[in-house]
A protein has these predicted regions:
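TPR/TPR-like (Sel1-like) alpha-helical repeat modules
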Residues: 83-108, 135-137
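Canonical positions in the second alpha-helix
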Residues: 25-28, 62-65, 99
Length: 166
């Protein structure tokens, strides 16, 4: 099964299935453990469908259900785009900073369109390469020129420069 289907009908079906499965976990166990990571896929799926409102609703639900969850890089990338699109630039910038703190390579890949040189110490940053490679190309393509220009200003900010130097 592909991570993200291509056809809108299939995307809607995947969204419904994941939402049903998450609700089923909640109903049966009183909590959501979600070992597969469906909670990270719903926002990107809504965005791929062109449903910014649905994506925003998902992220609000996510924040309420998983307040301590740091998210996955592709999840944070899409969350920041949704917030940017609805005019919440400060919150969107916060998500981009969280993305850089979690993975220093996703945002440069978005901005340059090229795979950055991975100069990390795998032992010091376990999972960072895997998470970087785990972001599907379709999610980078969601960003238009205006959003990319805004993301570049966030990337060049003193706060993000400090995060990148760690």
């Amino acid at each position: 099964m592909d991570l993200f289907p291509q056809e809108p009908r299939q995307i809607r079906e995947r969204i419904r299935r994941y939402e049903r499965l998450l609700q089923k976990e909640m109903d049966e166990f009183g909590q959501i453990s979600d070992g597969y990571g469906k909670r990270y896929l719903l926002g990107p799926l809504y965005l791929l469908l062109g449903d910014t409102t649905g994506a925003l609703s998902h992220y609000e639900w996510f924040e309420a259900m998983f307040p301590g969850d740091r998210g996955h890089p592709m999840h944070l990338l899409c969350w920041s785009l949704v917030l940017y699109r609805v005019g919440q630039q400060a919150a969107a910038a916060t998500r981009l900073r969280q993305l850089v703190a979690a993975n220093r390579y996703v945002l440069p890949r978005l901005l340059s369109g090229e795979t950055p040189v991975l100069d990390l110490d795998v032992e010091a940053h376990p999972g960072e390469v895997f998470d970087f490679e785990d972001v599907p190309i379709e999610l980078y393509a969601l960003w238009d020129e205006e959003a990319l220009a805004w993301a570049q200003t966030v990337y060049d900010s003193p706060e993000v420069r400090q995060l990148r130097s760690k």
